[in-house]
Every structure is written in C-alpha cells, then in structure tokens.
Amino acid sequence: MGAGESCGMRIVNTKELTPLKWASPKGKFAGEGIEISEALGRQPRSTDLRERHPFDVEILRIPPGKAPYPYHSHSAQWEFYHVISGHGAVRHDEGTTALREGDACIFEPGQAHQFFNDGSEDMVLYVVADNPIGEAWYYPDSRKWGVPIPERQNIRSEPLDYFDGEE
C-alpha cells in the first residue's frame, strides 16, 4: 500500500497541505497553521470521540515580530508546544520566557499564554492539544471570553451579584 491508502491507518504529508493563514486587522497578530489532525479526518464539531480524535496536532508558523494570538487561557484544554525552528518567547502567568529550537513547554487549563517571534526568521512550533468538548477561552488583557457555540463568539461581561436577575 502507498502513502494515504487505507489499512486502518491514515497518512498525510504535511509538505502537501495548504496552511491556513491569518492576520489581525491592524497587523499585530499573524501566523499560519497546518492542521494535521483535520487533514487526517478530525471532525472538530463532532461529539463522537472517534471522529474528534483524542488530540489535535498543528504546525504553527509565526512570522518575525508577530504573535499568532492574543494572550489567552483555556477552560479545559491542555496545550503542548515544541519549537522546531527559530526563536522567540512565551508570555505566561509568571512573566516571559525566551524559547529556542528544541525547547518544549506545556500549559494546563487556566494558564494564560502567548507566543511571539522576536527573531528575524519564522518561528515554527508543533502544537498538540487535547481539545475537550465544552472548551472556552479567556483573554485577560481585554477581559473577554471566547465560546464555541454556535460559532466562535467573543463576549465580555461585568461582574454580577450571584442573585442578579433571580429575584
């Protein structure tokens, strides 16, 4: 059997996949990702764990001088990162840590993080996430939540008394 042929195993070549590119309106955030798990058949909206896959794998490329995403945390998701090439830094709850090729780090649910490339060449990372059902994400700098239903939505609210609207 050749590459990609069915034997119960799925195979893709990441060099043949088209990266998803993004940039924020003012250009502060930019990046591109190769969604390996989705190319292997992962169905992110499914609640069937066989269709969702137990984890998601991405190759994330961050251009020089950019961060791919705002500073954020996840309500239930773990994320593992491995720097494949380039260098940069990661902002986290305790400060900022420099990263270089070969470094790996993990963030558990509730730990805010943001990667940025302070080098002159692209920073490339492998990202592995467990993508649990019911995940939401929080952006501490802008005090808003991201929720996946019905589509990705961002919301912001002010603190309310526990009984507000109940009596």
What is each PLM-predicted segment?
Residues M1-P54, A136, D141-E167:
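A short, N-terminal "cap"/entry segment at the start of jelly-roll beta-barrel domains
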Residues P54-F55, I59-P63, S73-H92, A129-D130:
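Short, conserved beta-strand element in jelly-roll/cupin
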Residues E94-P109:
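Short acidic-glycine-tyrosine-enriched beta hairpin
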Residues P109-E135:
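Ligand-binding loop in jelly-roll beta-barrel domains
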Residues G33, P54-I59, A112, D122:
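Conserved beta-strand residues within beta-sheet cores
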Residues A39-R45, E58-H74, P109:
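Conserved short histidine dyad/triad with adjacent acidic residue
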